[in-house]
Amino acid sequence: MNPNQKIICISATGMTLSVVSLLIGIANLGLNIGLHYKVGDTPGVNVPNENGTNSTTTIINNNTQNNFTNITNIIQTKTEEKTFLNLTKPLCEVNSWHILSKDNAIRIGEDAHILVTREPYLSCGPQGCRMFALSQGTTLRGRHANGTIHDRSPYRALISWEMGQAPSPYNTRVECIGWSSTSCHDGKSRMSICMSGPNNNASAVVWYGGRPATEIPSWAGNILRTQESECVCHNGVCPVVMTDGPANNRAATKIIYFKEGKIQKIEELTGSAQHIEECSCYGAKSVIKCICRDNWKGANRPVITIDPEMMTHTSKYLCSKILTDTSRPNDPIDGDCDAPITGGSPDPGVKGFAFLDGDNSWLGRTISKDSRSGYEMLKVPNAETSTQSGPVSHQVIVNNQNWSGYSGAFIDYWSNKECFNPCFYVELIRGRPKESSVLWTSNSIVALCGSKERLGSWSWHDGAEIIYFK
């Protein structure tokens, strides 16, 4: 082939490739236009509705590639309608307790940045359950951990984190600032309340949906405080128990009814309960029950029964002869429904809980009657109403060779069961005052939930070796 023929051949080949490329481009353009018309005519694709709560949103992303072909991605997302929680279901039958979560915060904190906390609890919402606690604004290994035995300081905050993890500066969310707290989800959004300030003039800030909604000043000038575990909501109404006044004498307790963070009604405590602190509340059958701490007199626990629809309440004492506060005397022959049963030393009380459901009633208490060590669950039928009621079943949660602490109730009200399954947590306190070789006071958490099966006991103690912190 001579040079002229080669040139003609190469030119012809180039022109052929150019024509083919042009035809491919025209075909792609036509296909892209056709796809756009088809998307516009499809009845299943809706215009985004930003005002509705039960809408379909369509997002069309046109991405231009290097070969000038437009690729259309269609993403459809549905937003579920948010509704207020209603406490219409009964409690589930419980024959024993199964492990739900254990964060091992102190063990992990020996070699990691774990926050110093106390007064922990769990609380659930439509998206799942989270752990909560009052942080001390420092880590276990931090120098500021010295002095964290004290309850109230400007450095404390209510934090929350994913259930099962240990709280660190990297995985926690600050809910509000303060040294006493409660928090609950109404089905639409979360309400959190924190108390802060000096003992003689503390105040509460109520947060709803991540924003401050209400402020409450002290009404007795003596450590305004609240539940230290979750509140409970019914049809948007969230009652919260608050106390202001002496810890060892008559104090001023109020039940405050909130809706979307705003006060709907305030009631002074009525009934036979003489002292109320640190209530543990749960809801079922449209009623909220709060089992509290009488820090003044009673080793039997006060019970507040709340009607959230009428926004009214009554109070009394747990009738059972099984005493559940610490310190406490030996269990008496008879309980008392209307008056505190005195006795026990040296500690005046500890936060605790119970589930009161006729034959399906369970009480929690420390195994030691004198100190915050060990923890057990006792099934006590009719504990709320019978002065003769005693245990028919028993399960060890923490053995008596290990420290416990506060305990409280919570329920995952969104678990789609035909009933509300009771759950509880136990605070496992480590450090001072019992273990003075370290400078800090902190805790880990263990949580369990009810089971219809009859499961065995095991000790879910903290497990950290304090000697490793020296």
Swiss-Prot record:
Pfam families hit by this protein: Neur
Keyword Acyltransferase belongs to the record: no
Record region (Head of neuraminidase): 91-470
Record's GO cellular component terms: host cell plasma membrane; membrane; virion membrane
Catalysed reaction equations from the record: Hydrolysis of alpha-(2->3)-, alpha-(2->6)-, alpha-(2->8)- glycosidic linkages of terminal sialic acid residues in oligosaccharides, glycoproteins, glycolipids, colominic acid and synthetic substrates
Transmembrane regions listed in the UniProt entry: 7-27
Active site, per annotation: 151, 406
Post-translational modification: N-glycosylated.
GO molecular function, one term: metal ion binding
Residues given in the record as substrate binding sites: 118, 152, 277-278, 293, 372
Role, per record: Catalyzes the removal of terminal sialic acid residues from viral and cellular glycoconjugates. Cleaves off the terminal sialic acids on the glycosylated HA during virus budding to facilitate virus release. Additionally helps virus spread through the circulation by further removing sialic acids from the cell surface. These cleavages prevent self-aggregation and ensure the efficient spread of the progeny virus from cell to cell. Otherwise, infection would be limited to one round of replication.
Similarity comment text for this entry: Belongs to the glycosyl hydrolase 34 family.
Other comments on record: The influenza A genome consist of 8 RNA segments. Genetic variation of hemagglutinin and/or neuraminidase genes results in the emergence of new influenza strains. The mechanism of variation can be the result of point mutations or the result of genetic reassortment between segments of two different strains.
Protein's name in the database: Neuraminidase
Species for this entry: Influenza A virus (strain A/Duck/New Zealand/31/1976 H4N6)
Taxonomy of the source species: Viruses, Riboviria, Orthornavirae, Negarnaviricota, Polyploviricotina
